[in-house]
Amino acid sequence: MLSINRNAGMFVLPDFKQIQIDSFRHFLTDLLRLELQRFGTIKHANQQLEFKLLGELYRLEIPKFNEREAVYQSATYSSNLYAPAYLVDKKRGIIQKQTVFLGSIPLMSARGTFVIRGVSRCIVSQLLRSPGIYYTLSVQGVYTATIICNSGKSFKLELDRQGCLWVRVGRNSKAPLLLLLIALGLEMRYIPPMIVQRTKKLNQLLLCVEDAKIDLCKRLKLKQKTTQIELGVTDPIYSLFLKPYELGRMGRLNLNKRLNLRVSEFEILLRSQDLIVASDYLVQVSNGIGSLDDIDDLKHKRVKWVSDLFCVQLNMALKKLNVAVHTNLNKMEARISRMSLKSVVSSNAIATTFFRFVASYQLSQFLDQTNPLSEIVHKRKLSLLGPGGLTPRTARFRVRDIHPSQYGRICPVQTAEGQNAGVVNSFTICAHIGDNGAIKTSLYKVCTNSMQGHVIDMLPGEDEYSTIATESCLVVANSSNQFQSIPAQHRREFVTLRWDEIGFRNTLPVHSFSVGVVLIPFLEHDDATRALMGSNMQRQAVPLLKLERPIVGTGIESQVALDSGTVITAVQECKIHNVDATQIAYVPKDSFELLYINLLNYERSNNATCLHQRPIVECGETVQKGQLIADGSATVDGELALGKNVLVAYMPWEGYNFEDAVLINERLIYEDVYTSLHIERYEAEARETNQAIETITKQIPHLNAHVLRHLDETGVVSLGAWVETGDVLVGKLTAKQSEGLLHTPESKLLQDILGVQAFGTQDTCLKVPTRGEGRVIDVRWITRDNHLLGHRKVIHVYILQERKIQVGDKVAGRHGNKGVVSRILPRQDMPYLQDGTPVDMVLSPLGVPSRMNVGQVFECLLGLAGGYLNQHYRIMPFDERYGRESSRKLVFSELYKASQTTNYPWIFEPDSPGKSRLFDGRTGEVFNQPVTVGRAYMFKLIHQVDDKIHARSTGPYALVTQQPVRGRSRQGGQRVGEMEVWAFQGFGAACVLQELLTTKSDHATARAEAPNAIVTGNLVPKPIGTSDCLGVLIRELQCLGIQLDHTMLSQHNMIQYPNLNEE
């Protein structure tokens, strides 16, 4: 009898941010020491001076700022790197030993992020092909052996249909393999006859080594290398095939395993013997001996994570440091008496390299902090893009598609939308990275002895020949299940096997999905496309002012909240001493020391949402280790809470929910159901340089006193002030040289005599932009001194905005059901239930059947029952393993229980279960058909109308076309296109259309005359002549040799043609 050890085989979900933290810890503890040890000794050219770095004794200093202070001061969260070094003067017998400063290294915070100049950033892991050799067969019948090096470069050995062996570098250049071996210096007697026989025009290739090198470079179309050989400058074969194609330790191991070689793993360069063995195996594969490789299999790929990327950057920085030390030693030879270690070592190499890497590297991205879920998902992304990887244009469909080896490792649902679909993916909840960058997954081992069941971690290649149950049915340890047929995976195929043939099973039903997808209840009832949209839109949900956890969830909400770092748990057993809005004071057990925990208090995130923490403990309360003591800005009792449980009805209402539009109740506004807080930051900078002086002051000439009313004596807005559009936040005057005084000779002479400059002032105040009104909650002064930029004062003003839901805002559910608010109805006009409760939202019923996301119906009905029973449900997806129609049975049973408890029989009507009769709030009449009503968990997304809507009266114009520029940020205007012209034509608004296309667009002369006519009270004159855009078109056609001309048409110059109908 087969069974599964449920007690000894307990499985705990890994920390969702552990991939980032473990990788950086590996860099600090292992790779950093290894790279510093390789730095070695640097000797001067004349062997007099010698520099040696003791890298194994390195030391990292405690950071100057912690993470929160770095954000507050707009600084970098980093640590200074020190190491002892020797400087030896052999001629004089002097040895200097000193601990030198090598540079600063950015540190990862406890949340898995980097803080660079006050901005949180995240480094995305990259999926690359593992170095080694791979055999494939093309559509044209050409067998190929692709050799991939450690840096991502590759070249190919080809066996064409005629049986000839070639080496190909790039797409369009190839040469015989025999020619390459001769150029590498291999004698003919050591080259196997098989390679010689498979070479065309053999007589032309029997050359000496130097001639072979020239011929090889010509065939590979390398003219520059050919010239270098002829001049005897360098050997290009080493720089072409040996140095760039460094296999590395992993590549050598893979090559040894694939070709059955016994070469030391420290032999990291490609050898000529490797090419001979690789070509021999290529011929065997063409004869049916051996096997081809699936290049898209995960066993042939590796993850390049934070530690690998930092190690590459450190290697580059140490090479720069090596060059700098050599240069400084040469300079020191002339003044050897003043020899010092500080003048030899330059700290700019490491600091500059790491800063540029974290600040501008393609995979170092601006952290998405819309909500805690978006932060977690961003840290668990896996990208095929980046240096050494693919681009959206070169990524084929086969690369983007789902591969069976990704089962349990890469989520098949959550990916980017658009051109990055299938290229940017996410790790599953059970995936973690092992040695050499392989993605592991956790599986339960099924065995005959229940005492031996345990969880194991499997590499991508290890589970290929294993039988894995996909957890679609409930596992019960009895004899009746021994011969039960269940779905399973075997040899990259999904098959049906008996229980006695199963070797492993999943640890969770959602074993194969990512964090964002697991949060969708009733996931198995949704189409994959809608599940993708639902998981992506959860990351766009805005934290609300009044939080509410979902009635229907999956049970992963608490894990997401805990791993996101937004909640605070007790690190030890203690007693709470004092609690306020900014900190929690506690006394540990068996101690009398008073410790403090600082809380976030209305801090701004990267996406302008509010970061805030609320204590949930009281003074005198005793808490245990791991107990929750503070909630975050999007959590309730330690569970993720991004939306609200609102009463929804699926029905049409006067066309206002046409095409996914949403009709909402005004209660959502008055009761702040969907009110959110947003914090905008505005920056003003004052510099003091030799060219100009900028002054922060309250005395601003030519400005109305009303817009300066909130400034204090220093010229900065006061805390707590309510500011509106146009109000001055920071008063600033910029001194500029007055041009009017320089035209007279007397003023120039006076300036030369007195040595003073004539300056004027310019108003450069920081003002509140359009739709930027709010409450000032913080003002921060940051002072920096830079020898290039001079003395700088930076002022950050933070304004808190309270945004209620309004027409144009976007709302969405967890099942991809999204829409835009089209109208807000009074609560008395909304449809209401039989108990008199008006619904909160009216959704379109057409959004369910065609999109196949039936999970939202199960969710809203179960939410309705939970609302009346005051219960919360945590249901893991794929509950069909408990039996057929398990979801429907559960929902109907809970609805029946709610109807019995509340004595409302209409909650569950047997004739139409899940539906009830609604009444029209305007007339009081009942609707014709029963309507599906329930409580759905709906979000308000960050795509808000306040950030999208834009109006323009006048503004900048493009220089060439003289049309309004594009974009809200540039105060641009929307062009009237073809469809807009049709709309005006349909209404017959000819004069309006004529103005839009000429005076208000690109007719510069008419545009200048229109304001004068309006001011003087005259009629706006009609435009005369053509517009500038037509002139641009004429010039472009003339460049193509096409001349446009115009002629007045009249009866005199029109040609009369005979009427053909008369014939």
Curated annotation (Swiss-Prot):
CDD domains: RNA_pol_B_RPB2
A GO BP annotation: DNA-templated transcription
GO molecular-function term, one example from the UniProt record: DNA-directed RNA polymerase activity
Keywords for the protein's UniProt record, in alphabetical order: Chloroplast, DNA-directed RNA polymerase, Nucleotidyltransferase, Plastid, Transcription, Transferase
GO cellular component assignments: chloroplast; DNA-directed RNA polymerase complex; mitochondrion
Major localization class: plastid
Keyword Kinase: no
Source domain of life: Eukaryota
Self-association state and partner proteins as the record states: In plastids the minimal PEP RNA polymerase catalytic core is composed of four subunits: alpha, beta, beta', and beta''. When a (nuclear-encoded) sigma factor is associated with the core the holoenzyme is formed, which can initiate transcription.
Family that this chain belongs to: Belongs to the RNA polymerase beta chain family.
HAMAP family: RNApol_bact_RpoB
PANTHER family according to UniProt: DNA-DIRECTED RNA POLYMERASE I SUBUNIT 2 (PTHR20856)
Protein name listed in UniProt: DNA-directed RNA polymerase subunit beta
Gene source species: Zygnema circumcarinatum (Green alga)
